[in-house]
Amino acid sequence: MTADLCDCNVEIFENNSLYNKNVYELDGILQCFDNENSLNLVYRYILKYKSLPDDTRLKLQIKLDTVVDRLIDEAKNALNSGYKIISLADPLSGTKFLGERGARIYIQKIFTDFLVRLKNPCEKYGGHIHICPRLSFLIYNYCELCIEFKKVRLSKAYDSLLEAILFESVDTVTACKCIHFLGKVDEITVLRWERDDNT
């Protein structure tokens, strides 16, 4: 992924009312395990994923399903309460913590399924998912799904990424720039699922 696709420059909103009213910050999957003091165990499972015994892999899957189900329910409740954007950041999933092999396994075996599941209620409620630059970078490099990162020109320039997402008709999933970005925004990066068939 090129540096111009993911822009990490950020200024923090001085007036947070628009942000607080519309953006729900959903914990990342690994952050949830950290909150439960089981992150180190999950890290070890991810790093040894391919060589895990079947029963251990099943235990990991049950743990993951429990956390993902809880996060999906939390996102649904937020959307039902009037939030417009589910903001996803999972700093504990970076290569700094997992290494390249672990990050690849995390994106391919865990995160992409979660993202697909989260996309459904967002579409139902007319909401959006925004993915932070770091997580966007991992998806771009390691995702096996047919996902296209596409820059979309907006109908006008906005003063922040948040305003662009809220006031412009863009795809459900946006990525790359930080949700807190302030400055001229006249295009936005969206994630589009390419069709696998020829129809």
Annotated model-derived regions:
Residues 1-199:
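Active-site loop segments of alpha/beta catalytic cores
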